[in-house]
């Protein structure tokens, strides 16, 4: 499976960005924020020019078309997601611990409203699920890569004897993925601030029912470590 890690977490050699590159990144930061709340279809050269108080011709120098702008915005959203969600989970050991870390960093990213409109990819998925074309294809590729990443860690947990042999790791990943998506929906639409705690409880319940004694020890040690970290 090609998971989210295939899109890279390593840092390139740091160099000072050119003025044009810096401007390009600043434009995309605003574009991502607009698209998260108003949708990628609501994002246009004109809408962005209005927000940035720039000329349309100036923006056309960076993006030749609306589709090009949308694809660049998706790539910026992917980069932010990697920084906010994927990279913080990577120091955790493969398997159950990393799966937990990935889910917690994802919940935290939604809860903290890193994007003005909530989870960028949840919104983009709902917007483009039935629309053919390059933008829809890229949304599907990126969201599937994240789900594949969760599936891979669940499979790794089973290989490490942390999950029961009868556990379906693909189903488990599907379930925990759905819990976070539901928390995002309940918070954004219903303003339900308890949705994240419910999602955490649901994830714990599913994991505890699927783990082996070895996996339960891993969960217990991790829970104790997190409590100590919070108390400091």
Question: What is each PLM-predicted segment?
Answer:
Residues 4, 117, 122, 166-186, ...:
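Hydrophobic alpha-helical segments that form the core
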């Amino acid at each position: 499976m090609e998971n989210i890690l295939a899109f890279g977490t390593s840092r390139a050699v740091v160099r000072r960005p050119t003025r044009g590159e810096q401007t390009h990144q600043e434009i995309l930061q605003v574009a991502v924020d607009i698209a998260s709340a108003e949708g990628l279809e609501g994002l246009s050269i004109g809408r962005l020019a209005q927000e940035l108080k720039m000329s349309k011709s100036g923006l056309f120098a960076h993006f030749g078309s609306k589709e090009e702008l949308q694809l660049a915005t998706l790539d910026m959203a992917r980069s932010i997601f990697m920084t906010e969600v994927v990279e913080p989970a990577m120091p955790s050991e493969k398997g159950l611990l990393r799966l937990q870390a990935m889910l917690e960093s994802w919940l935290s990213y939604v809860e903290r409203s890193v994007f003005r409109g909530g989870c960028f990819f949840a919104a983009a998925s709902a917007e483009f699920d039935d629309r053919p074309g390059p933008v829809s294809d890229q949304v599907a590729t990126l969201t599937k890569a994240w789900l594949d990443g969760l599936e891979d860690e669940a499979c790794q947990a089973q290989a490490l004897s942390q999950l029961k042999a009868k556990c379906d790791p693909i189903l488990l990943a599907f379930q925990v993925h759905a819990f976070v998506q539901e928390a995002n929906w309940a918070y954004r639409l219903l303003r339900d601030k308890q949705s994240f705690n419910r999602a955490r409880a649901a994830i714990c319940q599913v994991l505890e029912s699927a783990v082996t004694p070895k996996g339960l020890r891993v969960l217990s040690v991790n829970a104790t470590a997190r409590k100590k970290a919070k108390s400091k």
